[in-house]
């Protein structure tokens, strides 16, 4: 196999033109930086956890690019292209990583609070009555889905229009991705018992791919567009 990339928590190898192998490490990544300490068997845990959720989603009819687990800390996945020049992405582009992080928020916390204070987001945008003073930890009346960039050095918040233009998505495709995110969260709720306890910031994120038949996603995944045009997801480790 050919080693093609070193990430913060995994090594990436090319198996063949259509297949990659992820080798999960015991590294710890905090605020996009690797710290000196390691956690024994963390890589194995990440790999097994990803396989577990991909298996559940596959049974639910949600496509993903998991192929196999050749060892306890390695995963083989279908390869997709990463296109950094967004001007080359349109509705006809296939087999590429959709350059968006799709974030589903359930509580007022983290950066959402900062944007509420600055007026960039209003209470009514979140389903509250106009003028309501949102407090830290308030449960949102409805899940709030938004997108940030995925391939930039730092995540940047995007409007719906900006996200669709950057990723080459139609209105229908964009809504389908959001619906899939909510479906996955409902599956997590069923399996884990509490869909809204994933992080201290009250959010769950999903990055996507487009190939051609369908899209899908997983918790902390990347979206891709497949050959038939619809989105699905790919794994992300932290």
Could you say what each language-model-derived stretch is?
Residues 103, 199-203, 216:
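A structural signal for short, well-ordered beta-strand segments and their strand-loop junctions
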Residues 169-200:
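A long amphipathic alpha-helix within ATP-dependent nucleotide-binding catalytic cores
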Residues 10-11, 203-205:
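Short acidic loop-to-beta-strand element that houses the catalytic metal-binding Asp/Glu
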Residues 19, 196-199, 211-214:
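Coil-to-beta-strand transition motifs
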Residues 204-238:
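Catalytic activation segment of kinase domains across protein kinase-like and atypical kinase folds
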């Amino acid at each position: 196999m050919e080693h093609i990339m070193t990430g913060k928590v995994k090594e990436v190898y090319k198996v063949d033109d259509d297949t990659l192998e992820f080798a999960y490490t015991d590294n710890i990544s905090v605020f996009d930086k690797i710290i000196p300490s390691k956690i024994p068997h963390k890589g194995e845990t990440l790999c097994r956890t990803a396989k577990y959720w991909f298996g559940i989603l596959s049974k639910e009819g949600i496509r993903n690019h998991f192929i196999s687990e050749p060892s306890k800390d390695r995963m083989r996945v279908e390869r997709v292209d990463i296109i950094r020049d967004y001007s080359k992405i349109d509705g006809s582009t296939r087999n590429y990583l959709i350059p968006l992080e799709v974030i589903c928020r359930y509580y007022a916390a983290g950066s959402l609070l900062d944007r509420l204070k600055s007026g960039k987001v209003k209470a009514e945008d979140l389903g509250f009555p106009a003028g309501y003073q949102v407090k830290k930890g308030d449960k949102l009346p409805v899940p709030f889905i938004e997108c940030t960039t995925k391939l930039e050095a730092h995540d940047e918040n995007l409007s719906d229009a900006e996200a669709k233009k950057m990723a080459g998505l139609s209105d229908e495709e964009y809504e389908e991705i959001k619906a899939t995110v909510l479906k996955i969260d409902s599956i997590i709720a069923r399996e884990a018992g509490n869909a809204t306890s994933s992080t201290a910031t009250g959010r769950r994120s999903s990055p996507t791919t487009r190939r051609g038949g369908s899209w899908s996603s997983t918790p902390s995944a990347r979206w891709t567009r497949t050959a038939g045009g619809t989105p699905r997801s790919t794994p992300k480790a932290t």
